[in-house]
A protein has these predicted regions:
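Positively charged n-region of N-terminal signal peptides that target proteins for export
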Residues: 1-4
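N-terminal "domain-start" segment that seeds a small globular fold
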Residues: 25-55
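Short loop/turn microsegments at loop-to-beta-strand junctions
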Residues: 40-41, 63, 138-140
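Short active-site neighborhood of thiol/selenol oxidoreductases, capturing the structured segment around
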Residues: 55-73
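Conserved hydrophobic packing residues within short motifs/helices of P-loop NTPase cores
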Residues: 63-65, 96-98, 142
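Structural microenvironment flanking redox-active thiols in thiol-disulfide oxidoreductases
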Residues: 76-115, 125-131
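Bacterial N-terminal signal peptides
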Residues: 9-16
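Thiol/disulfide oxidoreductase modules built on the thioredoxin-like
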Residues: 110-118, 124-171
Length: 176
């Protein structure tokens, strides 16, 4: 009887922690505004052909660097809203979706398919890319202005084509 009570207590604690963690993943976005002088560091990633992806090549466009993985439910949930946002600004916004999948391109392809034609996918070239950028988990996104300066970070999955974040992207795209 005593072991049953202990087991039930552990089950309830585990359930409570799981529910709190799930809620935290979909909390309102935390945007950390940065000074314009904060230039984003090089991000080690490679495209499907194995070529390095360079943020410097995207200067002149607003860039969302989205760190994700195919096994991450919040990552998978936010991809359609990133696609819709990128489709709204095809000439001014690049969404660079950098996968942290250990299984590489086969894992990406199983999820990606042809679902996200407006997003540019890449694979992290180093296993600790998340840690290098100060992220504690996935998804994790950096917002970069047209001059290559970081203007915000989103440390969780969100709906990108709604609310405050959509307004920030619209303002960034409008500034030339």
């Amino acid at each position: 009887m005593k072991s049953l009570a202990i087991s039930l207590s552990l089950l309830l604690v585990t359930l409570a922690v799981t529910i709190m963690a799930a809620r935290a993943q979909f909390a309102p976005p935390v945007i950390i505004e940065r000074f314009k002088s904060h230039e984003i560091p090089a991000i080690p990633a490679r495209d499907r052909a194995g070529h390095p992806v360079r943020l410097a090549d995207l200067r002149g466009r607003v860039v969302i660097v989205n760190l994700w993985a195919s096994w991450c439910p919040p990552c998978r949930m936010e991809m359609p809203s990133l696609e819709r946002l990128a489709a709204q600004y095809p000439n001014d916004l690049t969404v660079l979706a950098i996968s942290n999948d250990a299984d590489g391109w086969p894992a990406i392809d199983r999820f990606w398919g042809q679902k996200f034609p407006h997003l540019r996918v890449a694979l992290a070239a180093e296993p600790d890319l998340i840690g290098q950028l100060g992220a504690l988990g996935l998804p994790y996104s950096l917002i970069v202005d047209r001059d290559g300066h970081e203007i915000g970070r989103i440390p969780q999955g969100i709906e990108w084509d709604k609310g405050e974040i959509k307004a920030l992207i619209a303002r960034s795209v409008a500034s030339r």
